[in-house]
Amino acid sequence: MASSRASSTTTKTKAPDDLVAPVVKKPHIYYGSLEEKERERLAKGESGILGKEGLKAGIEAGNINITSGEVFEIEEHISERQAEVLAEFERRKRARQINVSTDDSEVKACLRALGEPITLFGEGPAERRERLRNILSVVGTDALKKTKKDDEKSKKSKEEYQQTWYHEGPNSLKVARLWIANYSLPRAMKRLEEARLHKEIPETTRTSQMQELHKSLRSLNNFCSQIGDDRPISYCHFSPNSKMLATACWSGLCKLWSVPDCSLLHTLRGHNTNVGAIVFHPKSTVSLDQKDVNLASCAADGSVKLWSLDSDEPVADIEGHTVRVARVMWHPSGRFLGTTCYDRSWRLWDLEAQEEILHQEGHSMGVYDIAFHQDGSLAGTGGLDAFGRVWDLRTGRCIMFLEGHLKEIYGINFSPNGYHIATGSGDNTCKVWDLRQRRCVYTIPAHQNLVTGVKFEPIHGDFLLTGAYDNTAKIWTHPGWSPLKTLAGHEGKVMGLDISSDGQLIATCSYDRTFKLWMAE
């Protein structure tokens, strides 16, 4: 036992010869000092040559890949960033020195002038001021001054463009203006006196009279219908004594009819194309001799003719229009005649002096209709530019600009009360204007098609008559402007209308070649 244990012990303590062999240490390799090597290389002068040759050898061997477009200029990149930082620093410095208004509305106006949005989402007044300051620090404060200067210049040029120009008239125009002033002032005094007397009538009496009038108007019926021509009838006008009716036709003929039996009295031949209007002299059939000038008419070829009651041929021609004359109207005195022309002007003719005394521009398109104030002091014109103008004949100035219609104005008329004006337009509406307030006081949605004419009741202006291309004429209360009666019966467009001087008859003429008389039952 002992011997075996001893042998095992001996076995554990002994090891093979190859396991106990000593480890051989490798010798250290010394490459020398880098500093010494560099010093030696510089001493030999081989730095540039060796560097270039080594780089060239590496590129040829394919170990170094360098293309010409991948060169990165470190110094230039750093200088650009430095310039940007300096520019931003200078901008912030300028921004701190810029004074911006604390009024938010003014800040918004400045932003709008610079073409910037006046507000951003979630932006308050303080942020808006800071944004304006930053914008001004970039574009400069002179940009805002230049913008304001340009706005003022454009506004000034726009005002100059909208300025009303006047033709230099002859000395006879000055004489006519003085004559019109002397004529109109007494008539205005008389009208105001009548208005005061009417005001003294008890309210109950006036209300009762108005109710009776409305009842009579609601009972209007077609009293007479007459075929007037082979072509459409464009215009109709009652004589001052309400005993005759003049009609103008597209055939070039003008006809005079007796009222109320509608029998043909005269056929006036002289025009060669569509006749636009024919009107009686204010004193015709009242105090004017039949041999004198009793009517005036105009046509699409620019001709204007004067007629007497005892001849079928024109008494005289008024020359001077080169384009279409749409309407002609007598001044209340009967001395002057107004014509509207498609050359964007209207003209006033003195028939006693037999000359044109006024050639008035002011519309941007053709002038279609004209009306005179019953005092004789004012003239109103409506144009195809959708604007109307009121002119003072005593001074020549445009005293009121009628702006509001969306399309052409085809009819204009003064109320006998002296301060209301009605205009009818291609936008299917009739607007009522007040000379005292210098604005539109009511818009009547009158018809379903363009309005061709408007007419106030000639005595007191107690109602308004309108006609349109929807084949109807309508009567409206004044004041109130509520519908009273629709005059339906024409099979075509209503092209003209009129009210007799006594207010008892209404005439309408149509594209269906007929004219109709309407009378209360």
Curated annotation (Swiss-Prot):
SMART domains: SFM, WD40. Keywords: Acetylation, mRNA processing, mRNA splicing, Nucleus, Repeat, Spliceosome, WD repeat. WD repeats lie at residues 228-267, 270-317, 320-359, 362-401, 404-443, 446-486, 489-521. The keyword Mitochondrion does not apply. GO terms for biological process: mRNA splicing, via spliceosome. SUPFAM superfamilies: PRP4-like, WD40 repeat-like. Gene3D superfamilies: Pre-mRNA processing factor 4 domain, YVTN repeat-like/Quinoprotein amine dehydrogenase. Pfam families: PRP4, WD40. The modification N6-acetyllysine is found at residue 26. GO terms for cellular component: Cajal body; nuclear speck; spliceosomal snRNP complex; U2-type precatalytic spliceosome; U4/U6 snRNP; U4/U6 x U5 tri-snRNP complex. Its main location: nucleus. It is found in: Nucleus; Nucleus speckle. Transmembrane segments: none annotated. InterPro entries: G-protein_beta_WD-40_rep (IPR020472), PRP4-like (IPR014906), PRP4-like_sf (IPR036285), WD40/YVTN_repeat-like_dom_sf (IPR015943), WD40_repeat_CS (IPR019775), WD40_repeat_dom_sf (IPR036322), WD40_rpt (IPR001680). PANTHER family: U4_U6 SMALL NUCLEAR RIBONUCLEOPROTEIN PRP4, WD40 REPEAT PROTEIN. This is U4/U6 small nuclear ribonucleoprotein Prp4. It comes from Mus musculus. The gene is Prpf4.
